[in-house]
Swiss-Prot record:
Single GO molecular function: unfolded protein binding
Pfam families, per the entry: DnaJ, DnaJ_C
Protein's UniProt name: Curved DNA-binding protein
InterPro entries assigned: DNA-bd_curved-DNA (IPR023859), DnaJ_C (IPR002939), DnaJ_domain (IPR001623), DnaJ_domain_CS (IPR018253), HSP40/DnaJ_pept-bd (IPR008971), J_dom_sf (IPR036869)
Annotated function: DNA-binding protein that preferentially recognizes a curved DNA sequence. It is probably a functional analog of DnaJ; displays overlapping activities with DnaJ, but functions under different conditions, probably acting as a molecular chaperone in an adaptive response to environmental stresses other than heat shock. Lacks autonomous chaperone activity; binds native substrates and targets them for recognition by DnaK. Its activity is inhibited by the binding of CbpM.
Taxonomy, superkingdom: Bacteria
Amino acid sequence: MDFKDYYKILGVEPTADEKAIKAAYRKLARKYHPDVSKERDAEEKFKEANEAYEVLGDAQKRAEFDEIRKYGGQHGRPFQAPPGWESRGGGGGFEGGDFSDFFSSIFGGRSAGGNPFGGARQQQRSAGRRGQDVELELAVFLEETLSKESKQISFQVPQTNAMGQRTGFTTKTLNVRIPAGVTDGERIRLKGQGAPGSGGGANGDLFLTIRMAPHPLFDVEGHDLIITVPLAPWEAALGAKVAVPTLDGKINLTIRPDSQSGQRLRVPGKGLVNKQGARGNLYAQLKVVMPPASDESARELWTKLSEKAAFNPRTQWSK
């Protein structure tokens, strides 16, 4: 198993803030997205970027990674987790995310002694007491909000004896279905899925805080999606049919003649699902991209157009 330095994968410093990490992830995800990149190893690099953001975009996972990084792991070199830091439950982790063995070995489980729950409430140490509630952040990709498949998560819960004394930790694995209409920051309660109670007390609850991962192609506005559609000048001037990605696959979008940068075209029912099960809209925002006049023939064409076209984009200044 090789060490993965998630900072190197995203191309950021270990001191980078959340905004810089998100920006680096979006840049790489956009570059290597299967709908965009033709590079042979694009799919692997896209997966690596997703895995790196899964860790560095989550404060708890990032803190654990920073701790394990202190043991001197070098990117791409053989690595073995230090004593006392062992994966339990067969690696666990976010199996639905297609992440590496390194990810599973670090985040699939830790030996007793640490407390990975941060703000989890302290259980009272007496018989017949309710178990701890567990707080986790769950990274969700836009595509997962449309899928009816479950997402497998693994996390640690403290174990106690009948006297309420902590005896260690165990890894718990659940299959979680992403609710329709889920939004960033939403908190979901899974009753009885937290730590077990002591002395016959009830189990605690599991609280999942949803964190929507940035998408390389789409921005989110409520339950609507925004995608920037680059156009050549002749496509904007003459009209065209353009293949545009959606979460359901590509569609052919009709560009009307005389279209302008900044215009938005609405595609009904291609956004995210709301609480009632209806889909929002996809808005295609047009952006005219100028080709370079890099050779003599291209410059001649632009010169002829400038001579024949009675067009002044600054006419409003002369009023």
